[in-house]
Amino acid sequence: ILGYELINEPIAPYFETVDELNAKLEPLHKRAVKAIREVDTNHIILLGAAQWNSNFAVFHDASYDDKIMYTCHRYGGDATAEALHSYIAFRDSVNLPMYMGEIGHNTMEWQASFREVMEANNIGWTFWPYKKKDDSCMMGIRMPENWDKVVAFSEAPRGTYSEIRDARPDQGVVRQAMLDFIQNCRIENCIPQTDYIQSLGLEAK
């Protein structure tokens, strides 16, 4: 266990009471950290900022625990140090680590450039997700036979019970598709996405 991230992406930007909620985030963190330290004084505690882990201006006190790490997220934008300026500036102002807990796929070139920028600025990173059903991940999942029927049912109109019944596929078919999907998710059955892995500066085997 690396540590505990208290809340993932707290306080969306579209809430009408966003300023009021932002003001409550740090006090909530302090109460949670205090409770954790009653049973665990060892592990790091990761604190995500408001508005998709991006707004660190809501934090004013970093001195209440000696094992805090801040965590940011970013999807899209320029692959430059300027794009990360607010994260870097906050990190430097509190003299505590900043960890990019989520960053999403763009092009392989963008991904490689952004990784280099983060590493040059001493920001640890995790690209998200590790595996999914296409090639924008490290490990691709093969789609099983009849998976399209599962998807079609999940996307079908369901305003009434009649619509749900009409869209419902054969249960034996979709059950087998789900079981096959679970097997395909096993790491030994996934497909390494070589270009993606290499763009992260890692060796694909």
Where are these regions (language model features)?
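Extracellular glycoside hydrolase catalytic/binding regions
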Residues: 1-132, 137-151
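Aromatic-rich peripheral "rim/lid" segments of glycoside hydrolase catalytic domains that contact
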Residues: 110-205
